[in-house]
C-alpha cells in the first residue's frame, strides 16, 4: 500500500481493528479513516454508501462485527447472523462500487469445524459441524469470506 493511501478500518475500536490501526501507524501510514458505530452504522446501507462515496478509501480492513459471548450468541442467533451479514455485505458492496483497490475481510477461528484438526487449515472450512454456541456468527463470517 502506498504510504499516503486512504485506508478505512471498520471496527477500529475492537481488539483486532485497534491492532490494525496501531500497526498501520507504526509503519508510517497517516491517512487512516475510522468511524465509531455512532458516527456510521454499518447495518444501514444508505449510510455506508454515502460514506464510501464521500471518502473513497483506497483500502479497507473489515474488522467490524457484532460479537458476544456464549450466552449472547445462544440467545440471539438471528441477530448475530443478520447484523453481521448485513454489515459485511454493505461494506463489501460499497467498496466494490467505489473502486476500492483491496479489501481485507477478517474471519475468525470459529468459522472452522468444532473438531477441526490442529493446526487448522483453510481446506477444513465447511467440512463438518460448527460449534453450536456460535454457529450463527460463524455462518455470517463464512458468507462474507465466500
Briefly describe each language-model feature range.
Residues 1-146:
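N-terminal Rossmann-like NAD(P)+-binding domain of SDR-like oxidoreductases, especially those catalyzing
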Amino acid at each position: 500500500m502506498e504510504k499516503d493511501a486512504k485506508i478505512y478500518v471498520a471496527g477500529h475500536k475492537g481488539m483486532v481493528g485497534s491492532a490494525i490501526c496501531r500497526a498501520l501507524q507504526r509503519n508510517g501510514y497517516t491517512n487512516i479513516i475510522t468511524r465509531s458505530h455512532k458516527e456510521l452504522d454499518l447495518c444501514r446501507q444508505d449510510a455506508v454508501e454515502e460514506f464510501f462515496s464521500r471518502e473513497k478509501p483506497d483500502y479497507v480492513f473489515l474488522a467490524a462485527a457484532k460479537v458476544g459471548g456464549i450466552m449472547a450468541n445462544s440467545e440471539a442467533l438471528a441477530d448475530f447472523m443478520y447484523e453481521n451479514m448485513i454489515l459485511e455485505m454493505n461494506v463489501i458492496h460499497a467498496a466494490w462500487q467505489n473502486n476500492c483497490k483491496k479489501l481485507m475481510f477478517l474471519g475468525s477461528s470459529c468459522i472452522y469445524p468444532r473438531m477441526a484438526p490442529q493446526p487448522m487449515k483453510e481446506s477444513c472450512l465447511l467440512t463438518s459441524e460448527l460449534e453450536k454456541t456460535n454457529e450463527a456468527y460463524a455462518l455470517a463470517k463464512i458468507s462474507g469470506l465466500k
